Amino acid sequence: MQSPVQKGIAATAVLAILLTIAGCASTGGVAPQASGIEPASLDAGNAIRAANADAQWPAVDWWRAYGDPQLNQWIEDAQAGNPNLAAAQARVREALSMAGVARSALSPQVNGSLSIQRQKWADNVYYGPGPLAGEQSWNNTATLGLSYHLDIWGKDRNAAERALDAAHASAADARAAQLELEGNVVRTYIEMSLNYALLDIAKATLQQQQQIVDLANRRLKGGIGTQLEVSQAETPLPEYERQIDEIEEKIALGRNQLAALAGKGPGAGDSIQRPTLSLNTPAGLPSALPADLIGHRPDVVAARWTVAAQARGIDVAKADFYPDINLLASIGGYAAMGPLFQFLKNPSHSWSAGPALSLPILDGGRLRSQLGAASAGYDEAVEGYNQSIVGALKDISDQVIRIRSLATQADDADRSVAAARKNYDLAREGYRRGLTDYLNVLIAQNQLLHAQEGVAKIQAERLGAHASLVTALGGGLDDPANGPQANETLPAHGKGKAATAGSNTGAVPANATAKVESAGRPDKAAPATAYTDRARNARPSAMKPSPAAASGANASAMSAVTATSVPAAAALPAKSGS
């Protein structure tokens, strides 16, 4: 004969089966619609195809190619002190903490309470006069409760993975912020170098003009010149002096900008010396472009992790369609009479244990709307990823075109300076001999000035184009060996990391490309643990890891600090709803 406990368990099991069959709401065919772009399928264009394809991916310290120790120091200072970068790193830590909160749902929850009170019982309350009316006694309780959610449908696990994926996306965003900061420092430094070159030209032009003024005065004294010629020669002097003042202002503002990028006050920039930039590195592209681009651009990596998080969100929304089962147990002691520790004695003890089941029956379409929102969020993330790929290739193509054009422009500008200098020397010599008037000298001088400024600007643009190409390639986010596999595009809905939980490989995807160190600066990292797929059509009950395995996997994930990794998957979700 069955005991009452056995009968209760059997009845609960039968009820659970019946409610599971009858109560599982239909998803109504709600499913994602977007498809991810395969980078290799995009036409890279003639500019990229014609570029040197034997180059390596940029080094993590790519700015050292400029050979300027002062620039190296300022970038290091900016990495250590920039408030915006520090805020991005704080967001990574926040996301990791939230991942820990989500992971905690995979573990049993144990709570205890203790209440020790001395109480005088009223004789006219809701319980009416009784044996305690008007008396004083100890009213003590102690309870210990345990709850454990049976994550049969993978809701808690997918929620934990979604939070961890969001943390990876946040780390990739932090790396993108660092790359932007590095690029801004380099561009500001290049602009300062240009202004120093323009200052040299302006000072040389002023000196040349002063020599012409002296020549005009000598001609006037010699009786072969006029006061008009002297006045014409003196007229440009204030403008040239104004240009010098303007350029010096720009240099000072550049110092302030560098100090601000490093999180310092303006005074820190006062010691900045003239840049000594030189760049002998030829422009080229990696041979694996565009296939490996998805593993080297931090914005693309962040977009892929966002897709992974949204895919987990779909799984969470689907799990809400199924019954929810919690195992509950409690034990306690209760005593309103007797000595202080009466509640700890056997007659005062009580306990309870059993499952608690809930399931959706009528929800007015709430669950389908939640699933629709999750699917739309996934589609939005996929299209954001697609746009990042398209934008990345455009950025690279733009810089390749610029570099090629600037190389040609540099040759043209050099010839222009040579011709303008020759013309200026002839005009000046002719004026000195009285063979031509001052107007020809002024025209020739302006032509030389513009030609020299053109050379300086093109040189600066070439330095800047190199920096822009490096940042377009990801700025040394990762080595090619740590990049994603050639057939990996997006993390697919229904392809998660749970399958590896039992092997204790952790929940951090493979191909880690950056990390946020404890000191707070994103930097290069070795690959993290494996990210493997589970079957698209796996039964929900097969998605549940053991509590110990799930706990170990997520602990391993959190111990990996902040890995900006590349989620691996070969396909997008199937379009059919389930």
Where are these regions (language model features)?
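Hydrophobic, lipid-facing positions within transmembrane beta-strands of outer-membrane proteins
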Residues: 140-146, 188, 289, 351-357
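Periplasmic alpha-helical coiled-coil/stalk elements that build and connect Gram-negative outer-membrane
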Residues: 156, 172-289, 402, 447-448, ...
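Outer-membrane beta-barrel pore domains and translocons
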Residues: 113-119, 147, 195, 236, ...
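Short flexible linkers and secondary-structure junctions
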Residues: 25-184, 325, 329, 361-371
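Terminal intrinsically disordered/low-complexity segments used for targeting and assembly
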Residues: 2-80, 140, 164, 248-295, ...
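Sec/SRP-type N-terminal targeting helices
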Residues: 86-87, 103, 150-178, 228, ...
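Short segments within alpha-helical structural elements
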Residues: 210-213, 239-268, 317, 415-473
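Short sequence motifs at beta-strands and strand-loop junctions characteristic
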Residues: 134-138, 347-349, 450
